[in-house]
Amino acid sequence: MSWNNNESYMRKNIRKTVLLCLAILLMTACVDNQVPPQSKEFIDKYFPQSSIVLVEMDDDDNDGKEYSVLLNDGTKVEFDLQGEWKRVSRKKTGVPSTLVPKPILQYVKTNYPEDVITKLSRKPYGFKIELSNDEDVRFNPQGQFIEKID
């Protein structure tokens, strides 16, 4: 009698586990579908080991509506409605060097050899970076230094 109860209990738990796994897979697929194809390509190119865990639509920014995408490694990427990246924030390991314009990388290596770029933003004047030492620096569209921001 107790064997039948245990078997029934195990079947219920297996069903619940399978349903939970399916729900998680479906939620992940839904999250990926919320991102424009151009944004998804960007994420796949620069963050191939990461997956999307959250997509939010923001419209309280002065720059207009945008998507905020959070990756499972803590990276946050913000895109405009066309799927163009606006900001990349990656506190733990820094922004991928392949994403940063070469003159900006060289400037940081020369002037801040111990620091990494934790945030890269596209701005009307060019680029703004935030460093691991909490300094902010502005660059023109060609990646040439403009100024440090206090």
Located regions from the model:
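Bacterial N-terminal signal peptides that target proteins for export
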Residues: 7-18
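C-terminal motif of bacterial Sec signal peptides marking the signal peptidase cleavage site
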Residues: 28-29
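Short, non-transmembrane alpha-helical segments in secretory-pathway proteins
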Residues: 32-52, 95-116
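Amphipathic N-proximal alpha-helical interface segments
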Residues: 65-90, 132-150
